[in-house]
């Protein structure tokens, strides 16, 4: 086929694609465009006459101030969009702004108040607002149509009344609260709330953080990474239906997990002490005790090295609670010895699967395994994801698992190419307590 013929075929194929797209109903096109940033939606206006004004009918706005050369243009565009078909319901309203508008806080609050009032009237479903140091007007917290609320960098006022009967998802990142009660009031008005994510900022005005919800299924908490800022924080969780819990904090604060322990299925814990463990610090020991009891019924557990070290330090003073429901455990080791792992494993009588992520050479040596250990009588599957190089501490881990797991079915390990032959030879010398264990080398 000559070049002209190929061009005609490609042109015909292109026309067919355009015709197919052109034949789609307007409502479906708007639904597709709703998933794109508004700057890309506007670009479709040059496709054809049918598309010229279609972007105005899309029931959502998704704007980033960085796409505009001037702040005033950004504000004007939002105002223009809101003026189009003012009777149109909004499914999504998403704004991201990372600097002050001419440094005028009064103007910023006025803009936000105007837009929030408008989207509430237009029955908005999903609101996602990233803005600095503005206060969200109270009318938002009486929005009957809102399903998802995400706020970043703003200030949550002291709420006298909250009614968000349809909200299922809340994400609050670097939000400043008027006081301890602001978050409590917000949550209390969300009777069908299923997912709550909190990413805290320094000096957010909260000392006692209470999360109380009869409907909450997933809770993710990310405390401030600044040392010492939340030392005296009280975190209280009262969620009888909670299934998934994720906690990340520089240090374990005064925590209470009640009415949740029997419901939690999965927990991802990354919490350290923030300072050297003191066995004589009875209040801190009680905090650790209550915390471990609160998560002791989980089935799947992802645990960070710092948290495992907290557990080990506590175990030297008090017996650990039994994690009888735990069947899956994932752990990492960064600069601390894996030899603290068996202490925790012996509190998991029904553990079936163990995944070991990263393993690095420990900064300090321990003698935890100097004596005989209990058998891992329920362990069936182990995977070591980090490539092994044949180091002594790595082979000790493999030996411990193979020699103490009587029903182990499969051990999967990764070997570093540079030392594969050496590691393979060492593996062959390690005895296995389980005669049916399959060692898979990747």
Swiss-Prot record:
Q: Which residues form the F-box domain?
A: 18-64
**UniProt-listed PROSITE patterns:** FBOX
- According to the entry, every stretch annotated as the FBD domain falls at 363-415
Give a single Pfam family match: LRR_At5g56370
At the top level, the lineage of the source is Eukaryota
Instruction: Tell me the protein's name.
Output: FBD-associated F-box protein At1g66310
Q: Which organism is it from?
A: Arabidopsis thaliana
């Amino acid at each position: 086929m000559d070049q002209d013929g190929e061009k005609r075929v490609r042109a015909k194929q292109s026309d067919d694609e355009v015709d197919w797209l052109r034949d789609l109903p307007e409502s479906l096109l708007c639904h597709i465009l709703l998933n794109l940033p508004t700057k890309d939606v506007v670009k479709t206006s040059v496709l054809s006459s049918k598309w010229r004004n279609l972007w105005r009918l899309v029931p959502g706005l998704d704007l980033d101030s960085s796409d505009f050369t001037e702040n005033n243009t950004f504000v004007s565009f939002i105002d223009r969009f809101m003026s189009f078909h003012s009777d149109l319901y909004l499914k999504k309203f998403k704004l991201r702004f990372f600097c002050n508008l001419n440094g005028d806080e009064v103007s910023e609050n006025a803009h936000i108040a105007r837009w929030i009032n408008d989207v509430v009237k237009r029955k908005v479903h999903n609101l996602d607002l990233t803005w600095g140091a503005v206060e969200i007007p109270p009318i938002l917290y009486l929005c009957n149509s809102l399903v998802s609320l995400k706020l970043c960098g703003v200030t949550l006022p002291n709420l006298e009344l909250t009614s968000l009967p349809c909200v299922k998802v809340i994400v609050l990142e670097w939000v400043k609260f008027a006081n301890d009660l602001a978050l409590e009031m917000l949550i209390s008005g969300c009777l069908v709330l299923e997912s709550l994510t909190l990413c805290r900022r320094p000096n957010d005005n909260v000392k006692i953080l209470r999360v109380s919800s009869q409907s909450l299924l997933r809770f993710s908490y990310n405390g401030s990474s600044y040392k010492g800022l939340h030392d005296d924080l009280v975190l209280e969780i009262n969620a009888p239906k909670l299934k998934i819990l994720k906690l990340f904090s520089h240090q374990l604060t005064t925590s209470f997990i009640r009415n949740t322990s029997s419901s939690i299925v999965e927990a991802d814990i990354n919490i350290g002490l923030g300072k050297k463990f003191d066995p004589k610090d009875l209040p801190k020991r009680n905090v650790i005790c209550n915390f471990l009891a609160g998560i002791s019924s989980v089935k799947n557990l992802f645990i960070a090295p710092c948290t495992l070290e907290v557990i080990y330090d506590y175990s030297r003073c008090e017996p650990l609670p039994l994690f009888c429901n735990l069947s899956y455990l994932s752990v990492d080791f960064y600069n601390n010895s894996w030899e603290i792992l068996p202490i925790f494993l012996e509190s998991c009588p029904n553990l079936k699967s163990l995944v070991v992520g990263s393993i690095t050479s420990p900064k300090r040596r321990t003698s935890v395994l100097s004596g005989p250990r209990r058998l891992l009588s329920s362990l069936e599957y182990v995977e070591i994801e980090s490539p092994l190089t044949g180091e002594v501490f790595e082979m000790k881990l493999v030996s411990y698992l193979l020699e103490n797991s009587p029903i182990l079915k499969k051990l999967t390990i990764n070997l570093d190419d540079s030392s594969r032959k050496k590691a393979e030879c060492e593996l062959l010398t390690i005895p296995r307590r389980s005669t049916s264990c399959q060692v898979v080398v990747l």
